[in-house]
Amino acid sequence: MIENALPTDFAAKALAGSSTGVAFNVPATIFNATLAMNDERGRTSPFLAESLPRFDTDSWKVFPDGTMETTYRLKPNLTWHDGQPLTAEDFVFAWQVYRTPEYGQDRSRPIVWMTSVQAPDSLSLVIRWSQRFADADKLGSLSGNMFPPLPRHLLAQAHSDSGGSGEQFLPNNPFWNAGYVGAGPYKLDSYNPGVSIEASAFDAFALGRPRIDRVSIRGVNDVNTAMVRMVAGDSHYAADMFRGDEGVVLEQQWGPNGGVILWEALGSRELAFQFRPEHAQPLELATDARARRAVAHAVDRQAAHDAVTAGHGLMTETGTHPNEDWYPLAEREVAKYPHDPRRATQLFEEAGFVRGSDGRWMTPRATSFDLPIWYTAGSILFQQENAIVVDQLKQFGIAATPQVFNTQTSSNMERALLPGIIGGSASRPENFHSTFIPRAENRWTGGNRGGYANPELDRLSDAFVMAVDPAEIVRLNVDMASIVRSDLPHIFLYYHSRVYAHAANLKGPKNRLVQASGNATRNIHEWYWDS
């Protein structure tokens, strides 16, 4: 039996999900299956599919108008957990559900670009696309291209009766709770909301019967409780429960033979600038890239990394992860901002800033260089990171002040309009597209919270989404990174480690090496006990 130490709401999300149930959440790799899956290096292989579409073949056609058609062939004799056949019609039905606006997935990738999904026969799935989409051959392998099937034999009538009403189809249907039926390596036996999920191995799993017979997922909302359970041997696997310093403590308490810590250096950190002129502080950080570059040179990222990551993070000058294919090219072409107070001084002076006799900087408008730096409440590490950066900038003569933002009591609008600099998870270059700027029109949703806009980056991001040639994808990644590192909508800090812990005699969990590695439990069917 495996017992997971996970946040309290995980158990509820595992089955109820955020909009369409387990299909779009972390447990997809435990309770459901997809067309394709990625390994720890981001390499894609068939899952429910017997084969994946190949570019420039009959299975992946690109038409002159930019639309596409992909064809997946399913493995024969697939079944759901209840023994009923899983066919291409289940994907057709899933698409009909996901594109219903009330369910909240109709504008998400890849659903937003699917114009039709058809099943010429029980094993063939033909998808028409409104535009090019690079991941059209690997649906289900990543969170950004999820398209899991739904059991038509269980849900079609309920979906029809609901008339497309999410209020009727989702919370009122037992399928989304204790009645969940999927096609993943484990099938649901019992569900105690917010407390636990019990599951057993699925004999007919597409990749072979799991080697461990039973899995128990426990809800935990306290890190100390989770650590005690792991040390005592009551829990055998903890997914992303611990911060770096807590991982060190757990490693020490375990001793040399007590358990295994997987340090996954994929969590990225940034300092993002506010670009809305009426909210920028000071204004010059929104209007002059030289000022932003000066701040970047004034920050000692290595010192912040060393203090926060407990020695298990990863530094990179370009923001590109060293395990990405385009890393060597990015290292050659993308701007770097090493800690260099002299260069920071030069850039500030070029931008019209003046340093007073007291060592403090004044803006070109002869106002004090007051700079609020925000962090999210609830994390000691984020607070520690913030304190380090604030102290560094103060020593350089900037009137930096620590500010805390509480996501529980504040709105998306308030977060989007924060002045100064906001610490957070680093955005990939394509996520600075102007369509991701939070506005009143989109209810203040979107990851480009600082409101950065660059037409050339938008153009490259649009091309990136539609690129299918591997060489073109590499080139676009580097070109987007070059713009972001030059114009500097954010300061990339470092990669910190997510901590995954498991018992010493549990074999099979693997570190993810790139962002495109899929879920941490993607290979749970291969895990086994070493007696």
Question: Which residue stretches match the model-derived regions?
Answer:
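Short, solvent-exposed loop/turn elements at domain surfaces
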Residues: 7-15, 36-38, 43-46, 61, ...
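Active-site-proximal polar cores
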Residues: 493
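Charged, glycine/proline-rich intrinsically disordered loops and linkers
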Residues: 57, 62-64, 152-172
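N-terminal lobe/hinge region of extracytoplasmic solute-binding protein
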Residues: 2-63, 179-183
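Short, well-ordered beta-strand segments
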Residues: 1-4, 372-374
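Surface-exposed binding/hinge segments that line
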Residues: 108-164, 307
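Extracytoplasmic/periplasmic ligand-capture domains
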Residues: 58, 67-107, 113-120, 174-180, ...
